[in-house]
């Protein structure tokens, strides 16, 4: 208000849309698109249990590394407490929720070389499937490789195929299945869901009652 702002912060609105000749629609964006090669880095969103500030550290170093390689860096994150949302970290900052509908519109506007999801924790990793489905390049580890690592069942099958030893385990989708599975395994048991990081939803149980 008191002086001209030079900070490349962008906040979206759903009031104006652009329609391509093929009928595809996305939100209008005032950000000036350059002809530089560029990458988008997805942040981790707000801090919460199971996902801490270490992913912000990863995002910042990812942005700096991309800059050193000559890329224009575009950060998408919505946490004002992080370093990745500082005005002098990335070339552009979209202060947006790390949700698909926001990210897709930005990708359609900026047309990056690809998207980096591996640095933003579980929040960013969950976007990988959508990116792969829509044919948007994921820089680095592919969605299938990410899913292979996060799906406990697929990962254990891989370990079996590679003859790598691992603790006894089982997969249950209902309480009854978990109870029956516990009869075949010895307590204490480490119970945890797939597709989480940082121990979210993890519990050690020592008997059926705790299970």
Per-region residue spans from a language model:
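N-terminal beta-alpha lobe that positions the nucleotide/phosphoryl donor
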Residues: 1-211
């Amino acid at each position: 208000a008191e002086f001209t702002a030079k900070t490349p912060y962008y906040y979206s609105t759903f009031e104006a849309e652009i329609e391509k000749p093929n009928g595809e629609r996305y939100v209008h964006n005032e950000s000036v698109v350059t002809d530089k090669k560029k990458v988008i880095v997805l942040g981790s969103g707000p801090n919460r249990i199971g996902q801490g500030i270490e992913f912000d550290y990863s995002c910042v170093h990812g942005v700096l590394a991309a800059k050193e390689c000559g890329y224009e860096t575009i950060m998408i994150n919505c946490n004002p407490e992080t370093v990745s949302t500082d005005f002098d970290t990335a070339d552009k900052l979209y202060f947006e929720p790390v949700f698909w509908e926001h990210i897709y519109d930005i990708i359609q506007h900026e047309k990056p070389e690809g998207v980096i999801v591996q640095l933003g924790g579980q929040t960013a990793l969950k976007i990988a499937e959508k990116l792969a489905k829509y044919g948007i390049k994921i820089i680095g580890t592919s969605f299938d490789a990410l899913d292979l690592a996060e799906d406990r069942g697929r990962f254990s099958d891989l370990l079996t195929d590679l003859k790598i030893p691992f603790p006894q385990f089982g997969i249950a989708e209902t309480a009854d299945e978990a109870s029956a599975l516990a009869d075949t395994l010895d307590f204490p048991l480490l119970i945890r869901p797939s597709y989480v990081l940082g121990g979210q939803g993890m519990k050690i149980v020592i008997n059926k009652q705790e299970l």
